[in-house]
A protein has these predicted regions:
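Anionic-ligand binding patches
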Residues: 2-5, 11-205
């Protein structure tokens, strides 16, 4: 079975992508011996996702590995604060998830419009270099305090319009059904399914 390299060390992302791509087999960056620091200096989620995918793809090719690569970049965009934290979501405060959430909530003190969305750009690069880019968005509001599980990102302060609860309150299945990452990744999975990627060799796609 042909495998896919995931261009991330974030275990939460890895777990979510594995749930979306049921029956597919994956390799992590550690599995392939990739230990470079990828500089994410783009101005958009799309640019950063492409950078990660291309750097890892180049490494995969150099190691003569017959694998596709999937990367993504994603984050929270809050309308009232000029769509911050945006591409800086993971390092917004410099103090990790708790600090990031606190900074968003502090910036929204006294503000009524708490409209926000989660955005993801996902990139697939096939072994021959064919590249596919997909976007996913899911809309909601920022709560005034943390609600639900606090273990991942902004989930406990992002109230999903579709679910009627925060991502921190949602079950894994509920979140996967509406998440920005799931929306972006599903067309990539559909493409790989359509070419029977798991059963192909290089000459067949």
């Amino acid at each position: 079975m042909r495998k896919i390299v995931l261009a991330t060390n974030n275990q939460h992302k890895i777990n979510e992508i594995k749930r979306i791509f049921k029956l597919y087999q994956f390799l992590t960056l550690k599995d392939i011996g990739f230990d470079q620091d990828i500089v994410e200096d783009g101005f958009t989620f799309e640019e950063n996702a492409l950078t990660k995918a291309r750097v890892v793809h180049d490494y995969v090719v150099s190691q003569k590995l017959d694998c596709a690569v999937i990367a993504d970049d994603s984050g929270l965009c809050v309308k009232a604060i000029n769509y911050e934290p945006g591409i800086y979501s993971a390092r917004y405060s410099g103090l990790g998830d708790e600090g990031n959430r606190k900074k968003v909530l502090e910036k929204l003190l006294g503000i009524q419009d708490r409209t926000a969305y989660m955005q993801c750009y996902a990139v697939l690069i096939m072994p021959d270099g064919y590249t596919m880019i997909q976007e996913g968005k899911t809309y909601g509001l920022i709560t005034k305090s943390k609600i639900g599980d606090e273990s991942f990102g902004y989930d406990c302060i992002f109230w999903s319009n579709k679910l009627g609860k925060t991502f921190g309150q949602a079950s894994i299945e509920e979140k996967d059904s509406v998440s920005h990452r799931s929306i972006a990744m599903k067309p990539i999975k559909e493409y790989l399914d359509s070419i029977n990627y798991r059963g192909l060799d290089d000459s067949e796609y």
